[in-house]
Amino acid sequence: MGKVLIKEGTIVGVDKVYVGDVLIEDGIISRIERSIQEEGAPQVIHASGKYILPGFIDVHNHGSAGFDASFGTYDLGTGQFDSSERAYKNGLEKALKSYLKAGVTKVVLTSMAAPLDQLKDSFGHLKDFLQRDGYLSELVYGINLEGTFLKDPVYAGAQNPKYFFDVDEKVVNSLQVASGGSLRIVNIPPEHGEKGYKLTRKLKDLGIVVAGGHSAAYGDEYKKAIGEGLNLAVHFLNGPSRSNSKSFRSGGAVEAMLRSDRVFLEIICDGYHVDPSYVRDVIARKGFERVIMITDSMFANGMAHLEQFELFGLQGAVHKSREYLQVLGSENTLFGSVLNSNVGFSNVILWLTQEMEGTWHRTHKALPLNDALLQASAMFSSNPAKLLGIFDSGKGQKGTGSVEVGKSADLIVADLKADKLSISHNLLKGTVHETKNL
């Protein structure tokens, strides 16, 4: 791989923002100093006036650029998805390049409620793609199984209840085999009861993250599930999931997830799914250390001429603003997002640096820019890495999610001006990709 030297950038570290140089050798961050004079003709990135950040890790992303992780590639001409191996892999490649442009260095591709045979075929195509030797395969960190084990149609959101299945270890095993062992996150709403708790324990022991969302469960059911290993709230405050202010049954999912220090909260940060004032409220109540920003991006992201679509029995539409999706005929039911991570990061920086009236908190003070950068970087990079167990080095791999010596050089170089984060370089394990060439 050789050497890469990033010069005079503003480094967003773990606990401070400072100007310095970053030297990368064989894909690993080897030195971080105020000024590095390196012999041996390394590749040099001049980053004066730009930020050096850990790459974004999106743990909840269904697709982009016409690609859907469950159904393949959307054909605008026919209005149908092509799930053939060729179409799936071509669509995946386009989506991954769009993620690179947005500053993503790890993505967990997320599935919808769908026929099991459909998921097995798609996961098989993904497995074959990941087994080939190419830089894009480094970007994918497995699968988030969101829709398969949903239970209550009232809480379906934009998922099709026709394809909800009872929790079953055999189903998980079959999907795990089809994917080549790529399942990283599985959503098990606690209302499945003892069968769900048993599977939660099993998955936790296997190192798979167990999430809860789209859920009718009460707080006491969530408390039990959290005790068994559930530690992720699926797109918190969306889904929907039950909230209960009464004194019975320890509230609902919202209350249980806020109260537990074991649980990370996903937040879709497009400004539509969750009002910015609530985003500030959640960060203040939970602490930024347990919040993970996600896109929940759908295949429609980047499709300029798409207006309406069907996704395995569900009718959707692109809002006239082209900034979000909704279930056709139901303006209040959102259908994933068209958000890119760099835009989400810019949104969060803007919200954190503004004084804002809250709902659970009367007011939120404007943070200094450097404090906002540290918090946002944690929520987009460090926290998802910690959730997935890849923040620290070990078991033959280098950690990721922060700009530190000894970590994998999964980094971005970016310009932040006028509330817009523009990515100039994305580094995957030290290999430099200029976004203008993608």
Model regions and ranges:
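His/Asp/Glu-enriched, well-ordered alpha-helical/loop segment
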Residues: S250-L265, A284-T295, N301-L411
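Active-site gating loops and adjacent loop-to-helix segments of metal-dependent hydrolytic enzymes
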Residues: F71-Y88, K97-K106, P153-S179, K224-F264, ...
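Metal-associated gating/positioning segment near the N- to mid-region
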Residues: K50-Q118
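Metal-dependent enolase-superfamily TIM-barrel catalytic cores that perform enediolate-based chemistry
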Residues: F123-E146, P153-A217
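Histidine-rich, glycine-flanked metal-binding segment
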Residues: M1-L53
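Conserved, mostly hydrophobic/aromatic
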Residues: L145, A233, V348
